[in-house]
UniProtKB/Swiss-Prot annotation:
Designated gene of the protein: chlN
HAMAP family, sorted: ChlN_BchN
GO biological process, one term: photosynthesis, dark reaction
Keywords per UniProt: 4Fe-4S, ATP-binding, Chlorophyll biosynthesis, Iron, Iron-sulfur, Metal-binding, Nucleotide-binding, Oxidoreductase, Photosynthesis
Protein name, as recorded: Light-independent protochlorophyllide reductase subunit N
Pathways involved: Porphyrin-containing compound metabolism; chlorophyll biosynthesis (light-independent)
Domain of life, source organism: Bacteria
Amino acid sequence: MTLADAQPQALNFECETGNYHTFCPISCVAWLYQKIEDSFFLVIGTKTCGYFLQNAMGVMIFAEPRYAMAELEEGDISAQLNDYNELKRLCEQIKRDRNPSVIVFIGTCTTEIIKMDLEGLAPKLESEIGIPIVVARANGLDYAFTQGEDTVLAAMAQRCPTQAPTAEADKEERNAIQKLMNFGRKQEDVKREESEYVDHPPLVMFGSVPDPIVTQLSLELKHQGIKVSGWLPAKRYTELPVIEEGYYVSGVNPFLSRTATTLMRRRKAKLIGSPFPIGPDGTRAWVEKICSVFNIEPKGLEEREAKIWQSVEDYLQLIRGKSVFFMGDNLLEISLARFLIRCGMTCHEIGIPYMDKRYQAAELDFLVKTCQEMGVPVPTIVEKPDNYNQLQRIHELKPDLVITGMAHANPLEARGISTKWSVEFTFAQIHGFGNTRDILELVTRPLRRNGALKDLGWEKLVEEARV
């Protein structure tokens, strides 16, 4: 082995500033309105935004979902109508029909272009109707659709209480869910559970994940004696976590850099920079990093990770030695690539619409470390990739699997390249130790389909159909 071979490989970043495809960030309404149960989302935009939401959500109007579309008309754009009066009328109707704890205004490209001052209108509307109004500019000017959640959470972070409530009524309201979870349990059991935690500064997690994931990740930290003080967003707006100066915060998704910045600058919180808890390797590194910050010796993580890898060996055999190519869509690419490399795959290229190197620094370091341990080359990271150039590279490299946005899936399949929609990873449960099988189920599905076609002798028919 030469000296050059022994040197650690460095990450190679490129920026093509080309045309790539991703959804509009207003799609964040699809999962956030379900996560925050007492909220109402009002998207202020054109008919195009309405058509997109209607198609993306797939919720019939009879279901009375907790979101609506405020369509801008010619009178709004030409300033013939008064924005304040129109929004006040809509908010009063929302209060009368649904009476939410918070109304979230989602700005769109059009509100940006016509310079609609939503931030200026919101405080006055809020005082008149008596319901908090949060303004989030989750418009198509962002790089990726997942950044819509980032914008909403950054806006909500500024609404988190700065100190714990002192009034009994406020305490009752904020602890309603906790009381429900402890219903039927003896007081001694609750006190004993509290004594299991180590004394450490308060820790708040941020990132919208399904309730089972919240429970799983909180339990993983509880096993190490770490108590999670709260989650942003909470199940209810009235239960937003208290964030005081000096509190520690940790993100569970790679696309929340704006929220992290807001928590550090506005709320003076301390960010724990760690790999994200995606896959057993990422979850272990995430827990270990939090433990190291609180000077806690982690226990049982190595055995837990080994057990998970052993339980998914049947899936690993399908992808070990195969190659993957990320076209870039939802900002989960770095974490997923690192996980798949750990599974035994090689990654040619990681396309990503936007790369915050500070927020993802720990994940990038972990990617390099994983590549070195697995003995594979470090993939090139292409920011704002040009899809035309990517298609040329895919044609040359011929990867076994391409993880891509929906726009390119069918054209690539028609050229004999196996694909997987990246949007599926956004909505699937991929965090924590317990969901490793779910990620591998998604990744291996196209490969298993190809194997089934081959076994049935239909592979030749499929190739003829492509021609």
